[in-house]
Amino acid sequence: MENLKNRTAREVLDDHLNLAQKWEGAEVDLETVVRDDLERNVSQEIVVLTNRGTLHGYQGVMELALMLGEELPEHNAFQYTYVSAEGRMAFLEWAHVDATTRVRDGADSYLIEDGTIIVQTIHYTVEQK
């Protein structure tokens, strides 16, 4: 079994982002994709700060993922427009486009320790086309 605790912040972020791209397509089981990500990359005590509220733990991450799945129902791939990491911190800018909605201002930040995301901030605005 691979040792995930010794990964750099960038390695954790890259793994998280690669798994997030697996949600593409309506036939994908979003909960399975999220569970895989939780097991590999997310602390059980994670705190997620969003413009929709503060969420805690695996249950909070799952709630947020399901909400995002409803807001972006075509489940197209995310476009990662900027990715960086330094020390324990990482930052992501992202966008999403489908037939009826778009996100142009996605911005997430991450605090990563011992190979897991312990704090994440998320901001995005869903626009109807």
Regions found by a protein language model. Give the residues of each.
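Short, low-complexity N-terminal intrinsically disordered segments enriched in polar/charged residues
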Residues: 1-40
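Hydrophobic alpha-helical core bundles mediating ligand binding, dimerization, or RNAP-core interactions
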Residues: 13-20, 42, 65-69, 92
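Short histidine/acidic/glycine/proline-rich micro-motifs that form metal-
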Residues: 22-24, 52-55, 97
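A beta-strand edge to alpha-helix "cap/lid" segment located at domain peripheries
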Residues: 1-8, 62-129
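Low-complexity, compositionally biased segments
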Residues: 17-18, 40, 54, 101, ...
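A solvent-exposed, acidic/Ser-Thr-rich amphipathic alpha-helical stretch
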Residues: 32-86
